[in-house]
Amino acid sequence: MGHKPLYRQIADRIREQIARGELKPGDALPTESALQTEFGVSRVTVRQALRQLVEQQILESIQGSGTYVKEERVNYDIFQLTSFDEKLSDRHVDTHSEVLIFEVIPADDFLQQQLQITPQDRVWHVKRVRYRKQKPMALEETWMPLALFPDLTWQVMENSKYHFIEEVKKMVIDRSEQEIIPLMPTEEMSRLLNISQTKPILEKVSRGYLVDGRVFEYSRNAFNTDDYKFTLIAQRKSSR
């Protein structure tokens, strides 16, 4: 197979298959055993080749699922208020949510301020992981006024929150005030997003408003930066 180390030759072959379109973004690679047989090498050599391609952001390894050709990062346009499902709708991929917490809690002083509610009001507290296929993409924690959504269900939060608000509740969403914060992931974030605790992530803190001025949610979203790119268009103000 030439003078290059075997693992680099295997990595080159896989890279060529991707370039020719034989392997497409999102495609699963054969198992390590199958690659061993195909190339006539040891499992250690196969793992070295795959690890190199993962480090080069060509492949991605999903724990408990396998190794895949890495898909293009999701473009998160800060000026477009769209749901997780809407951001991925043009890619025709499976998206789903795993709900970890679904409960009603009293509103402390902080939540009263963020949601513009009274001490007597209670709120929904929901935590969920958002997936593209089997890949955890984001960890979302949301608080919503119970008075606005007394009929919110676990099933709604397994799907699209915005679809429920707009299509079922017939409410009109106006805007979201957002703040993007770089931070180091907590142990929980690292575990749920399947990333290293030494890898920086981005957290989006937002407050959503209905067209009548009521706040319908306060949320915190932690994003795996391998899967997202944040874009905005800045126009220079004329000095005339």
Curated annotation (Swiss-Prot):
Q: Does the keyword Transcription apply?
A: yes
Looking up InterPro entries in the UniProt record yields: Bact_HTH_transcr_reg, Chorismate_lyase_/UTRA_dom_sf, Tscrpt_reg_HTH_GntR, UTRA, WH-like_DNA-bd_sf, WH_DNA-bd_sf
Q: What induces it?
A: Induced by mannosyl-D-glycerate.
State the UniProt keywords alphabetically.
DNA-binding, Repressor, Transcription, Transcription regulation
Against SUPFAM superfamilies, the record matches this protein to: Chorismate lyase-like, Winged helix' DNA-binding domain
Query: Listed GO molecular functions?
Result: DNA binding; DNA-binding transcription factor activity
Q: What did gene disruption experiments reveal? A: In cells lacking this gene the expression of mngA and mngB increases by 9-fold and 23-fold, respectively.
Q: Which GO terms describe its biological process?
A: negative regulation of DNA-templated transcription; response to heat
Pfam families, A to Z: GntR, UTRA
PROSITE patterns with a match to the protein in the record: HTH_GNTR
Q: Write down the superkingdom of origin.
A: Bacteria
Record-annotated disulphide pairs: none
Q: Give the PANTHER family listed for this entry.
A: MANNOSYL-D-GLYCERATE TRANSPORT/METABOLISM SYSTEM REPRESSOR MNGR-RELATED (PTHR44846), MANNOSYL-D-GLYCERATE TRANSPORT_METABOLISM SYSTEM REPRESSOR MNGR-RELATED (PTHR44846:SF1)
Q: What does this protein do?
A: Represses mngA and mngB. Regulates its own expression.
This chain's protein is named Mannosyl-D-glycerate transport/metabolism system repressor MngR
The scientific name of the source species is: Escherichia coli (strain K12)
The record lists the lineage as:
Bacteria, Pseudomonadati, Pseudomonadota, Gammaproteobacteria, Enterobacterales
